[in-house]
Each structure stands twice: as C-alpha cells, then as structure tokens.
Amino acid sequence: MAMAPVSQVPQPRRPHKWYQHLYVQVLIAMALSILLGYFAPDVAKSFGPLGDAFIKLVKMIIAPVIFLTVVTGIAGMRDMKTVGRVIGKAMIYFLCFSTLALVVGLVVVNIVQPGASMHADPAKLSSSLVQTYVQRAHDTSLIGFLLNIIPATPVSALASGDILQVLFFSVLFGIALASVGEAGTPLLKVLESLSASIFRLVAILMRAAPLGAFGAMAYTVGTFGIRSILNLAMLVGTFYITAILFVLIVLGSVARYNGFSILKLIRYIKEELLLVLGTSSSEPALPGLMAKMEAAGCEKTVVGLVIPTGYSFNLDGTNIYMTIAALFIAQALNIPLSWGDQALLLAVAMLSSKGAAGVTGAGFVTLAATLSVIPSIPVAGIGLIFGVDRFMSECRALTNLIGNAVAAIVVARWEGKLDKNQLTAALNGEFGPVEAGEDLAGHVTTS
C-alpha cells in the first residue's frame, strides 16, 4: 500500500515547550471546558458550534483521504503476478484479524456497556437530521444498501462524500491504474503528490483540535452534566484494557504459535513505539519498522508489501476502537441496536477502516465515515466522544503498529521467507539497533 515518501515522514525536531504539545493543549482545553460546563452550563452550551465546526472539517477530508490512500496503494503494486501470492496471504491474515479485532470490541462493549448510564438526548445533538434516523432505519434494505455502494458517477461519490461509494470506485480505479503499467506512472506521481498535500491538510486541521475539544466537551458537560465525564472515562478505560488484552492474548497467541514472543517483539520495536506514542501516529515509524523487520529475518520483498499494505488494511487498534466507540454512542443516546444492526456495523466498519491512514485523527475520521452509513446512529453523536478521542489515538496507533509487525513475521514464515535464527537473534538483542532508512527508500515511496 502506498505510504508517504521518505520526505513526508516527519523528521526529528527541536524539543517543544510543554505547552506546545497538542496533547497538552487538548488536555488543558478539556479541563477548562469541564469547569465551564460544571459552573456555567448555559454558557458552556454556547460553545457547541466549535465542536460542530471541527467535526465538519474532519468530514470534509474523509473522501479525498480514502480515495488517495486506496488508489495510490493499489496502483503502487506494479507487478501484480509477482506480488499476488504474498498480497493474497497478507489479505487473508488482515481480514481474519481485522474481523477478530472488531468482534472483540463488539463483545467487550456489550458486556461493559460504558455509555449505558449517560442518557444523552439525541434531540440535543443540534441536528435536524436526528429525526430522520428512525425512518432511515426502516427504509434501508440489504439490497438497497448494496446497490447504493455503486455510485452514479465517480464525481458524485466524491462530491456527496458517500464513503462506501468512494471506496468502491477507489479500488476499481487503483486496479485499472496498476494494470496500465508505465503509462500510469505520471498520474500515480500526481496522486502521490496530492496525497502528501491532503495529509498536510489533515495535520493543519488537527491544530484546531484543542478548540474543537473545548467546544465539544463544554457542550457535553453543559448539556448532559458532569456525570457524562465518568462515562467518557469508562469509555477510554474500556478501550485501553481491550487493546492491551488483544495484544497480549490474541497477538501473543499468534506469536507463540509462530515461534516468537510478543513481549520480546515489543521490546525489539520499542523505539518505533515511543515515536508512535509521541506523535499519536504510526506513519512516522514506518521506515524504522521496515528496517527492523528486515533485520529480524523477514525477506525484503515481504516486508515491502506487507507492512505498507497493513497500514491501511491491518488496523487492529482502529477496529477495536470503532466498534467500542460506535456502540458507546448508541448506548449513550439510548438507541437499542439489534444483533443485525451490530452485524451491519461490523461489516461497514470492516470496509470503511480500509481507508484509514496512519495519521493523527484518522481513527476519528474513520468512525465518522462508518456512522455516516449506519442508519440507526446519528453521525452527530461523535461529538459526545470527540473530547476524549485524542487520548485514545495513541493506543490505536500503538496497537496498529504491533499488529503490523506481527503480520510481517507471520506472512514471511507462511511464505518460507523467514530466517528463524536471525529472528531469534534479533528479538534476543544479539546485535545492535537498526537505523531507519537503510535501503528503504524504494519501499516507502512505491509500495
């Protein structure tokens, strides 16, 4: 899957002062908004448009992000026959464990029910569309849902922002662009340049996150009371515990079956994990992760295909988050979801998560994309969790990164392209650290 060129990967910068970190700014904004919502609820509710505006900004970039990520990724795989077997096996792995992550999140949130006592009023989500969701739930049929995935025109899909239509066209266009070979190279380069610009736009929009968090949290506390914060804290805790258990138990079992320790792997890629923790994004860690997987005995071809592709197709942390967050919103709004509704949510999340990028805020973008095609849950409901979403992004990115490291080793072993002795030596720390960028430029720019 095409990822950001080396030049796009953020380079080390001089240390920021503590108050310049986005994480700190969001934390301060949340603290102030909670105080305002508690002591002056009427005033706090007036700041709701700040959160609404930020959500609209996020929704604005959903379609281009998915289109460019999917098209450049598929088109970048030039020799389809050579890479087909590796990609096929990788996709089987991605499908199985992405589905498992979604199911795990679904099961946990049904058991814990972190939003059940919030009792938020859907009518107070400041959206006149809320009243249409019940009717849409009755009007939507399976056949109609499937037919609606096919857009009338490519332009209409992008203009309307229908995520499944955008994804459908993106996959077809990516395959077509890859099939024309060198004739498609100029267009691919243009799309990669445009992708860099869109990712930069995402970064720019994320600078407004403190204002959006302030507005969303102030409105939430002012409207629903301080008890809502307890529910949000429970949401964050539920997600973190679920992600940790998924890594240790599910991925740990996979690692043990394939002859290595998940804890040793985590220690081996600790520098990349710290980079992810500092940026809330798995993208900056891509070159280092690829270098380390090669050094750990995975063949370069497998690494160059599996890891970049996994950045869009193997997002375990994002998938866990999506089902937990979506059902939290439904529980908070007292919207009962049947098992059929939850199965639809799982299916849509499986598709929409394939357009998620490894950048800060992408999980929230993907959640908005998912809810936009689920008739029972108001998209405006994401405003309930926006204030704490920033504090779940690190866990999403960390889980995604670990999942892709495991995937590279498993697929390499599956293909017979893994040096087991080298893997053991690497995980036991028997040679020095590997630096990012060692013969990786070609992979990062064209995979």
Swiss-Prot record:
Keywords: Cell inner membrane, Cell membrane, Membrane, Symport, Transmembrane, Transmembrane helix, Transport. GO terms for biological process: L-aspartate transmembrane transport. Pfam families: SDF (PF00375). It is a multi-pass membrane protein. It comes from the Bacteria. The chain crosses the membrane at residues 21-41, 57-77, 92-112, 141-161, 163-183, 201-221, 232-252, 320-340, 345-365, 368-388. Gene3D superfamilies: Sodium:dicarboxylate symporter. Responsible for the transport of dicarboxylates such as succinate, fumarate, and malate from the periplasm across the membrane. Belongs to the dicarboxylate/amino acid:cation symporter (DAACS) (TC 2.A.23) family. This is C4-dicarboxylate transport protein. It comes from Granulibacter bethesdensis (strain ATCC BAA-1260 / CGDNIH1). The gene is dctA.
